[in-house]
Amino acid sequence: MDLGTTKYIIYTELIADGYVEKHDVIGAIFGQTEGLLSNELDLRDLQKSGRIGRIDVDLENINGKSFAKITLPSSLDKVETSILAATLETIDRVGPCFATVKITEVEDIRVSKRQYITNRARSILRKLMDEMIDTYEITEEIKESLRTEEIMEFGPENLPCGPNVVHSDSIIVVEGRADVLNLLRCGIKNTVAVEGTSVPKSIMDLTKKKTTTAFTDGDRGGELILKELLQTCDIDYVARAPYGKEVEGTSKKEIMKCLRAKVPVEQIVGNTCNDTCNVSKVIENRPEEIVEPITHKYYEKVETPVTEPVFEDEIVEEETVIVEPVKKTETEIIDVDATNEIQADKKFSGVKEIVDSIKNTGNVKFVVDGTEKTNTFKEFLTNIHEIKKMDFFAADMPISQKIVDLLYDKTPIIVGKEIHVTKKPVNLRLFSFDEIVA
């Protein structure tokens, strides 16, 4: 059915008591409605002028009766269409047979069109949004291409580096090209990569002339490269990516945090007693979110000006800071009468045995409801939210202020390899291993 300019469709059902044919039904519609209404609503005139469409009749003859479904398109307004529909119900004979006619529905075809328009518009919009390139993506794509163009080459080995490496007073040494690119994304342009575990001679010479920060991955590979750098280059500061992460996969916020937390190389060497820099053990015992940055046991925390990374075209002048060793002093934080108190107080019974059991293991041991439990420090931090109260806590590691702040309301006693805190809650007892075994 060609709807054309149709506004409404009248659906009608007709039942005749005898056998009739389609032309009988059409004749009855035109014949019995003729003259009922004014000439403006005469079906023949309306059809000639195109204001109503072709009348469709779907006829069936069953058991001596005839059943017809009649469809009449109308482009009249709703009032005239309603009058026309009511007129059809006045038909009472078709041919020689009695008949009844009933209007089943008058459909506003424009509603269907509006629904189609709505659904189709949704589909088109969804397709457009899927195909549309976001402005942010365009911006990032352009920035990425510019950053890639900014990567330069340094030395006869053609090492990837940032554009400010030659002119800056300070440099950051990383592992590979991807690390240089990630730091460029963060606006850090004084970076150069060693491209492997064998440090090129041009890097060795460059580190002698500039203040150098070694920034390596937080895994075993990063530790090996750091060892190589410390043995072959003149490194001033050391920074590590978060534990288990690579520099190339670290976010801008984490990179800035790591670079600001860099430590002088003297502290790294001191921590390992001038050994081949066993940094992994230090890092494993120092989760970033809890423990203070690495400090040598013969050094107090010293505020030192550190070099910020160079951003964009900015070149920062730096001074080499020498960390002087200072003598460890007794403070009121540590209980002076620790040995006598431990021997006198029953709640400290068994402490020496617990301390002996975790010495040189890097583990922690704590007592909950009379039950002793042993974990690595990392496992302990993971499950700490499940622990409400502890009778006792001991760790084969230095006790920092952050550990005290974390545990002061969970246990009355904390024992560690060393005590490095500035504030102690009144109801908390802090003991070092040396005091326990004295």
Swiss-Prot record:
Entry binding sites for Mg(2+) 1: 175, 217
Needed cofactors: Mg(2+)
Record keywords: DNA replication, DNA-directed RNA polymerase, Magnesium, Metal-binding, Nucleotidyltransferase, Primosome, Transcription, Transferase
Subunit field text: Forms a ternary complex with MCM helicase and DNA.
GO cellular component, one term: cytoplasm
Species whose genome carries this gene: Methanococcus maripaludis (strain C6 / ATCC BAA-1332)
InterPro entries on file: DnaG_primase, Primase_DnaG_arc, TOPRIM_DnaG/twinkle, TOPRIM_dom
The protein's name in its UniProt record: DNA primase DnaG
